Amino acid sequence: MDHQAHGAGEKKGIMEKIKEKLPGGHGDHKETAGAHGHAGTVTHGAPATGGAYGQEGHTGTTGTGLHGAHAGEKKGVMENIKDKLPGGHADHQQTGGTYGQQGHTGTATHGTLATGGTYGQQGHTGTAMHGTPATNGTYGEHGHTGTATGGSYGEQRHTGVTGTGTHDIGEKKSLMENIKEKLPGGHGDNQQTAGTYGQQGHFATGTHGTPATGGTYGEQGHAGVTGTGTHGTGEKKGLMENIKDKLPGGHGDHQQTGGTYGQQGHTGAATHGTPAGGGTYEQHGHTGMTGTGTHGTGGKKGVMENIKDKLPGGHSDNQQTGGAYEQQGHTGAATHGTPASGGTYEQHGHTGMTGTGTHGTGEKKAVMENIKDKLPGGHGDHQQTGGAYGQQGHTGTATHGTPAGGGTYEQHGNTGMTGTETHGTTATGGTHGQHGHTGTTGTGTHGTDGVGEKKSLMDKIKDKLPGQH
């Protein structure tokens, strides 16, 4: 641990020394330090057994937070952990903020770690916070746990992570960006410009229940995540955008213009129960999600748009301009019961979702438009002009019971969605087409005040189904 490290200069962190010589680790990183730098890390527990032809069996790390470390140039904990993994190449530029940019703490592992696989980076154990969380520094980011990987030829079976969030001023990368950015196949140039006086970062996430079982040749079986949202002013990525931004096949150009007076970010999502079993060659078996919505002013993406925006086959250019004084965002969705089993060659078996609607003023997408906007086959450019002082949005949907069984070569087995609920057994999907959709009901829109053009609930449900453009 580095406690009360004083003075300026350039030095290497503990994790940088550990990871510096691992195979295939290449990366150029630039950081301009703020004040009160990053804490060191330690490892606990039995390391995993290595496999073959790859880097396997790395244990997690723990840190105590930040303790009066003064200015200088050094790397963060998560950057050091993931910086040298095979296939991870990226150029990063960060410009420090003011008044206390503090670094990220590490993670802790407890118990027996996983056994490595072959021909790739496998067998990294997840880390969990059991007992005493990391010790606070000053306005620092602490208590983040790691992730677990396993399977073959791809990044599979990642569990969620938990944390308490970040509290400081200045520009930094979110937790999920640090976790996903250096995994095999993750390449990206990231540039962030710091805000001032209160740009607070993204909260961590967590999973509940049994994560999904990964398939092959793709990223499958990711469990849901939970979070409480972000708070502050400035331009930043949403939680789900960070999670999905680097998935295979996920391409998109996004432009966001920040608002003023409290642009607060997106909440995470959570899964309960047993997630669906993954299929093959695509991303399958994603469970539903819940969230509390977003509050604040400025341009931002909805929760569901962030979730679906980067799925394989989903390509879009999204432009949003923030409103003013109370643009409140979209609520998430939740699934209960047993999700559907995934099919093959497409995205199948998605369960229904619930939400409470949107409230506020400004330009935003409705809940159902966000849900259906990026499904395979659904392509469209959307432009909406926000109303003023009270355009209240559409209610979400919920499904209960047994979802339909997925078909093949298309998107099948989607359960019906209602403004209120659906009960009973849904239809069984067929083949080579979109089959088995149950009927939908809606309650309409309530309390629409002000000026603006918007679609009804049922239009949003039906507008973006595959084959309808």
Swiss-Prot record:
It comes from Triticum aestivum (Wheat). This is Cold shock protein CS66. May reduce intracellular freezing damage during winter by hydrogen-bonding to the lattice of the nascent ice crystals, thus modifying the structure and/or propagation of ice crystals. InterPro entries: Dehydrin (IPR000167), Dehydrin_CS (IPR030513). Belongs to the plant dehydrin family. Keywords: Repeat. Contains 7 A-type repeats and 14 B-type repeats similar to those found in maize, rice and barley dehydrin and rab proteins. Residues 87-112, 203-469 are annotated as: Disordered. Induction: Specifically induced by cold temperatures. GO terms for biological process: cold acclimation; response to abscisic acid; response to water deprivation. Residues 93-112, 203-214, 255-274, 383-402, 412-429 have a biased composition (Low complexity). Residues 288-301, 439-450 have a biased composition (Gly residues).
